[in-house]
């Protein structure tokens, strides 16, 4: 079993392109050090792929439901937390990035964008009107308080006789 994540050719956010000339002395310059062609950085593609596959964990504590989303590089203005139909928590984000590089020989502008949207049906004991969200170091934390569990009303019955 392999633990290495493979890219999917049909996934628009999977931008790990195969270079058939990589490793040849006169290849396209992707990672070959002996290439005569300029090397272009590929950092934006891995950032876009990481963003598109935003990981969200849902943990239930005695007091609340806690959602933690990894959204590296996003500002809080680029993330939305919404409640739809009273019990659907929706977490979404969008990033548009432009990187420009100029030299005497060439001018390159690379644009990348990505979106994610995740929806969760909240359980009946959730209080959607009291949801709080915070963001720190690329991690969005959404806390949904829970209603207190109703204790059963137990009534003692005397036994006659």
From Swiss-Prot:
Disulfide bonds: none annotated. Keywords: Host-virus interaction, Nucleus, Stress response. It comes from the Eukaryota. It comes from Oryza sativa subsp. japonica. Its main location: nucleus. Belongs to the small heat shock protein (HSP20) family. Pfam families: HSP20. CDD domains: ACD_ScHsp26_like. One of its GO terms (cellular component) is nucleus. Gene3D superfamilies: 2.60.40.790. Residues 47-161 form the sHSP domain. Signal peptide: none annotated. InterPro entries: A-crystallin/Hsp20_dom, CS_dom, HSP20-like_chaperone, Small_HSP. It is found in: Nucleus. This is 17.9 kDa class I heat shock protein. SUPFAM superfamilies: HSP20-like chaperones (SSF49764). May form oligomeric structures. Interacts with the rice stripe virus movement protein pc4. GO terms for molecular function: unfolded protein binding.
